[in-house]
Amino acid sequence: MSARVSLFVNCFERDYRRVLAPGFMKAKAGQFQFPFERVVVTLNNIADSTAAVALAQEARRRGELDEFIEVAAALPAALEKCGLSLRDLGLVRHYMDFALVAVAAAAPHFLLYCCAEVDLLTPFDWITDAVAKLGADPRLLVANPSWASDPGGAQRESIARNGDHWVGMGFSDQCFLADAGRLAAPIYHHKHAAGERYPMSDLGDTFEKRLDAYMLHHGLLRLSDARVFYNHAGIEGANYPKLPLFRRILRKGKKVLGFQKASPKTSETLSGGAHLADNHSMKGST
């Protein structure tokens, strides 16, 4: 029996017409070659929400998605479940809210979140193996394909090998699989200097920055499948203003000074016998 996994795709003002157009979500779900329990689209920060809802209803009637969620309406319950307030989200609210809503709505089952601009290079079911491994070892929190922008990156950043997966630190919200029950919890108040490497980090604490900090503080790891790669076609942070010059200089200085530290809590041994290094570099994590 397949695990209960829901696919969530978020859309913004810039792309909701494309995401909800005929064929898009069918193709998005099909590339994973997995029988999702639900295919869900979240509607986020859209100027004409009535128009977006109408398109989502049409997509549901076509059978391309099972559900759509308006992020603004679902956010209060998600914030409560995750121990956050609207004020906590700050300037990067829309780099946080959709993910909180997704994990809250998918819990207590598995969530595959995939950015609308992410596609696998080759259709492949990497989910079945990943679900089994995530369920078998609580030290493994998330799983993802390897990233095509740096084909050797997952191996280079790994600290162990587990079958077809590289095991390492780091997190990206571009495409990830997780037990949503573990993420729909008050785990998002951690801070870690390694978060400076993330886009938008000077504007605030995004979802991926917060979850990465939680993982580092608790010695939690991710699986990157060596058999499958994804491509992200978008421009990170396109909807947010550029930082003032002095803040960009400050950010550059922090990176030069080597603020990308690894957690001291990852010196453990996997069940397969591979030792986890405690000084693994976080630089370049996708």
Give the residues covered by each predicted segment.
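Short, charged/polar "capping" segments at the starts of alpha-helices
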Residues: D15-R18, I46-L55, P151-A154
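Conserved catalytic core of nucleotide-sugar-dependent glycosyltransferases
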Residues: V103, L121-M200, A213
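Active-site-proximal specificity loops/subdomain of glycosyltransferases
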Residues: N44-A107
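Acidic carboxylate-rich catalytic motifs and surrounding loops in phosphoryl-/glycosyl-chemistry enzymes
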Residues: V39-N44, A72-A73, P145-A148, L221-A233
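Short, acidic, metal-binding catalytic loop of nucleotide-sugar glycosyltransferases
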Residues: P22-E37, E58-R61
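N-proximal low-complexity "stem/linker" segments adjacent to membrane-targeting elements
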Residues: M1-A29, V41
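C-terminal catalytic/acceptor-binding lobe
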Residues: C175, A180-G181, I187-T286
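Short beta-strand-to-loop acidic/aromatic patch adjacent to the donor-nucleotide binding site
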Residues: P108-D119
